[in-house]
C-alpha cells in the first residue's frame, strides 16, 4: 500500500497471524532449511536460522502459509517488496469501485502476479479484498477519489488510459499494440465502465468472444489484458 491511501494502512503492513502457519507434518519441503511441507506453505524452520536480514523471525518460528512463490518463503513483507521493486513493469491498472465488487480483489491478485507498477482504486476508498488473498501487500495500491483524479495522475506521468470493455468503437485487443506506459481500466462486473471513466480514456479494447454471452467476467478479462500487455512489453 502507499502513503496516499492512509485509510487502508499507509506503508506496507506486517503479516498478521491469519497469514502465519503453525507446525504440521508432511513430506519434506525446502531441503536448505529442513522444513516440513504443510498443506499450504511450509512449517517452522529448524534452528539455527540463517543469518539473513530478509527473513521474518515470526515466520521462521511459526511457519509460512502465505500465497508467495517458494523463493520468498520466510521473507518479510518489506523484503519481498524491495526485491520486486526493480522489476515492476510500466503497466498500471485502474479499477472502478462503485459497488464493493468481489472481482476487485481478484484483479489485484493478478496485478501482483504480473508485478505491475501500480493499481488504482477509483471511487470508494474501501474495496473488497477477499479475492486478493493478501497479495495487495506486495504492490502499490493507490486510491483515486474520482475519474478526474485518475486522469490527472495519468497525464502527469505520461500514461495512456485504455479501457477494457466492449463499446461500439472498441478495437480488438488481440490486434492492438498497447502503449508501454499504459493504464488498463476496468469497470464493475455488471455495469462495466461508467460513462465518465470511459470518456476519460484515450481508447478502448475488447476481447473477442465466440459464444452467446455478452461479456466475460471482469477479473478474467483483466487477466487476459494484463497478459497481452506483458507479451508485448516484458
Task: Please tell me what each predicted stretch does.
Residues 1-234:
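Post-transcriptional modification and biogenesis factors for structured RNAs
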Amino acid at each position: 500500500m502507499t502513503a496516499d491511501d492512509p485509510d487502508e494502512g499507509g506503508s506496507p503492513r506486517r503479516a498478521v497471524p491469519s497469514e502465519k502457519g503453525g507446525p504440521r507434518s508432511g513430506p519434506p519441503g525446502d531441503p536448505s532449511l529442513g522444513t516440513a511441507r504443510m498443506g499450504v506453505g511450509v512449517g517452522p524452520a529448524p534452528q539455527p536460522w540463517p543469518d539473513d536480514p530478509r527473513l521474518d523471525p515470526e515466520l521462521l518460528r511459526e511457519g509460512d502459509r502465505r500465497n508467495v512463490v517458494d523463493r520468498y518463503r520466510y521473507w518479510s513483507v518489506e523484503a519481498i517488496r524491495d526485491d520486486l521493486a526493480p522489476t515492476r513493469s510500466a503497466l498500471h491498472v485502474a479499477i472502478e469501485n462503485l459497488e464493493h465488487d468481489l472481482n476487485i480483489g481478484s484483479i489485484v491478485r493478478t496485478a501482483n502476479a504480473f508485478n505491475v507498477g501500480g493499481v488504482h482504486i477509483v471511487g470508494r476508498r474501501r474495496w473488497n479484498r477477499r479475492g486478493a488473498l493478501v497479495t495487495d501487500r506486495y504492490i502499490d495500491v493507490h486510491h483515486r477519489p474520482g475519474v478526474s483524479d485518475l486522469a490527472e495522475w495519468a497525464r502527469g506521468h505520461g500514461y495512456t488510459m485504455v479501457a477494457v470493455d466492449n463499446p461500439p468503437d472498441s478495437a480488438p485487443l488481440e490486434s492492438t499494440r498497447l502503449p508501454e506506459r499504459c493504464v488498463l481500466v476496468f469497470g464493475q462486473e455488471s455495469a462495466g465502465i461508467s460513462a465518465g471513466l470511459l470518456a476519460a480514456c484515450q481508447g478502448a479494447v475488447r476481447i473477442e468472444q465466440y459464444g452467446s454471452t455478452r461479456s466475460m467476467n471482469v477479473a478474467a478479462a483483466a487477466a487476459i489484458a494484463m497478459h497481452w500487455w506483458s507479451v508485448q512489453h516484458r
